[in-house]
UniProtKB/Swiss-Prot annotation:
Source organism of the structure: Allorhizobium ampelinum (strain ATCC BAA-846 / DSM 112012 / S4) (Agrobacterium vitis (strain S4))
Biased composition (Gly residues): 21-35
Originating gene: rplO
Name of this protein: Large ribosomal subunit protein uL15
Database matches in InterPro entries: Ribosomal_uL15, Ribosomal_uL15/eL18, Ribosomal_uL15/eL18_sf, Ribosomal_uL15_bac-type, Ribosomal_uL15_CS
Alphabetical UniProt keywords: Ribonucleoprotein, Ribosomal protein, RNA-binding, rRNA-binding
Compositional bias ranges of the Basic and acidic residues kind: 1-18
Gene Ontology terms: biological process: translation
Role: Binds to the 23S rRNA.
Length: 159
């Protein structure tokens, strides 16, 4: 078999039907749209209209809300911090905070603070100051001989 010998399976694709090209074509004049009415015009389909049936957006109940005061943290894993230390982007002897992580390119956007997650391994002794951390992250940092100070999100924002 050669690339130039490959063919589609029989019946796997149909030719496009050109509508409105003369009565003799079988799809001329009205082009398979019937006669007049909304569906014969262009720009049909009323969004969300289901033919008179109660539409799904009205059948389902309204639920929940978006809390405008909720804090949104930028998450960073221990594995990424360790990678940055190994690459020489982060100084392990200095305190690692949100500004240091941003400067090193570990995080892109600083939202309401940084939250450290326990994904990956940490082998270097570090001092971290962030808005929050998960329990596994705290355990891994302390196991590596480091310390972590968790600030409030408001305190980190003001820095």
């Amino acid at each position: 078999m050669k690339l130039n010998e490959i063919k589609d399976n029989e019946g796997s694709s149909k030719d496009r039907i050109r509508v409105g090209r003369g009565i003799g074509s079988g799809k001329g004049k009205t082009g398979g749209r019937g006669v007049k009415g909304q569906k014969a015009r262009s720009g049909v389909a009323v969004n969300g209209f289901e033919g008179g049936q109660m539409p799904i957006y009205r059948r389902l109940p309204k639920r929940g809300f978006n809390n405008i005061f909720a804090s949104e943290f930028t998450t960073v894993s221990l594995g990424r911090i360790q990678t940055a230390i190994d690459a020489g982007k982060l100084d392990a002897s200095a305190t690692i905070d949100a500004a240091a992580l941003k400067a090193a390119g570990v995080i892109r956007r600083l939202k309401d603070g940084v939250r450290v997650l326990g994904d990956g391994e940490l082998t270097t002794k570090v001092t971290i100051e962030v808005a929050g951390a998960s329990k596994p992250a705290v355990e891994k940092i302390e196991k590596a001989g480091g310390t972590i100070k968790q600030l409030s999100a408001a305190a980190e924002k003001s820095e």
